[in-house]
Design a protein with these regions (language model features):
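N-terminal secretory signal peptides that target proteins for export/translocation
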Residues: 1-10
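Intrinsically disordered, low-complexity segments
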Residues: 1, 19, 28-29
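Hydrophobic alpha-helical segments and their boundary regions
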Residues: 11-12, 39
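Intrinsic structural disorder/low-complexity segments
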Residues: 8, 14, 28-29
């Protein structure tokens, strides 16, 4: 790849990062995902901050200001996530997406420390599929243990964009392999069951732009 291509690629990736990875700035430890019982009224929250304005303002009415997970007060459903969860969940097209680690494994074949992006059904919290990313060999130098996926996803139509713990910008089909189709240019996913992510394309920033 020549310098012009690298520069162009870097501009594209930087634009993506401005949209996708802002959630790292608002990191918080969590081991559960809680969804409000308030009717969303069709109002998606498809990116960090809700809209490109990043003003964190919802146009929904009657939003609860208190929750009790144990008593299920103003809580629609609760599901376990990994031991650390950074960034923010996003909601789009009837699904909830959130990055975490593999400390609450959904697939017994996936063992050890991984970066995990999970998809759930918005109405009842049913687990739908997950994207799995191996840790970088350098460990703490580039990929701190158990931090998992730190970026907040961005959803546009039927495509989800996020940044992995390996510094890759990835586009996924929001249906995963549940639609029994392998979409996009990537056809060699190691995990391609019904509950696995369908990768459309991937851009490795560490390899391509240094």
């Amino acid at each position: 790849m020549n310098s012009i291509q690298k520069t162009r690629g870097l501009r594209i990736v930087l634009a993506m990062l401005m949209a996708v990875s802002g959630g790292v700035l608002l990191a918080a430890h969590s081991s559960r995902l809680t969804v409000s019982a308030s009717d969303p009224g069709g109002g998606d929250w498809p990116m960090w901050g809700g809209t490109p304005d990043r003003n964190m303002v919802s146009n929904m009415k009657g939003i609860p200001i208190s929750w009790d997970v144990q008593k299920k007060t103003n809580v629609k459903w609760v599901t376990a996530l990994g031991s650390q969860t950074y960034g923010n969940p996003v909601v789009a097209g009837g699904q909830v997406y959130v990055g975490t680690n593999n400390e609450a494994p959904r697939d017994p074949k996936v063992k050890g420390d991984k970066g995990i992006l999970m998809a759930f059904r918005e109405t009842d919290g049913e687990f739908l599929w997950q994207a799995v990313t191996d840790k970088l060999a350098a460990g703490r130098v580039n990929d701190w243990p158990y931090q998992g996926i730190c970026s907040s996803p961005l959803v546009e139509g039927k495509i989800l964009y996020y940044v992995t713990n390996r510094g890759e910008v990835v586009a996924l089909d929001t249906e995963g392999f549940r639609d029994k189709e392998n979409d996009g240019a990537v056809k060699d996913e190691k995990l391609n069951g019904e509950r696995d992510a369908d990768v459309i394309w991937k851009f490795d920033m560490m390899e391509e732009v240094g």
